[in-house]
Regions:
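A C-terminal functional module that forms or caps the active site or interfaces directly
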Residues: 117-166, 170
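Alpha-helix C-terminal capping segments
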Residues: 25-29, 47-48, 146-154
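Mid-sequence, gly/pro-rich, charge-dense loop/helix-turn segments that line enzyme active sites
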Residues: 44-132
Length: 195
């Protein structure tokens, strides 16, 4: 552990613009050396169940569509990158810490797809899977990843799965949210201690 470690914790409203702005503020004002973002997401993979954790290998914008200008779906115009790679060192540390802190929870590593919409329709979910693959779908990770990437800051997006992204959620959202927050706090505190 570094003796100079001083973490900043932020809270922002939902959506990609808010997430990107928050990340840019962390870069510009606080000069952060890494960004670890935790939250909840819907599952895009049949093996990833409610309560499981997904650690990002990369993040992308599933709702970006500039095909008419010759870009791939998901690719931001005038950028070569199709997705933004998460930091491997942070991901390995998170995987290790997850097993130590929450051994009963399954941990997956994979792509996280972001868009400014809550996915609860199976046909929309299936379209995202067909186009991009991925393990989880949510509303902030790609903006965080993009801002971190453009600022040359290592990042990791960590998501607890809250639903199957198909309208079949059975657990009370407030109940799940509290459990997810508890797991995320344990994970983040432990990761910071080991950085």
């Amino acid at each position: 552990p570094r003796s100079t470690l001083f973490p900043y914790t932020t809270l922002f409203r939902s959506g990609k613009v808010n997430a990107g702005m928050c990340t840019q503020i962390l870069a510009d004002i606080f000069g952060v050396e890494a960004v670890i973002n935790t939250g909840i997401a819907g599952s895009l993979n049949n093996d990833v169940n409610i309560g499981d954790i997904v650690l990002s290998t990369d993040v992308l914008h599933h709702d970006m569509d500039a095909i008419g200008f010759g870009y791939k779906k998901g690719q931001i115009p005038q950028m070569d990158e199709f997705s933004f790679p998460a930091d491997e060192k942070l991901r390995k540390l998170a995987a290790k810490v997850c097993k130590e802190v929450n051994p009963e929870i399954s941990v997956f590593e994979g792509r996280i797809c972001s868009g400014d919409q809550f996915i609860s329709d199976k046909s929309v979910k299936d379209a995202i899977i067909s186009e991009f693959g991925g393990f989880a779908v949510e509303m902030e990770g790609a903006a965080i990843g993009q801002a971190a990437y453009l600022n040359h800051i290592p990042f990791l997006v960590v998501r607890a799965i809250s639903d199957k992204a198909d309208g079949s959620a059975h657990m009370d959202y407030a109940e799940f949210e509290m459990a997810a927050i508890e797991h995320s706090v344990k994970l983040t505190v432990r990761m910071i201690q080991e950085l």
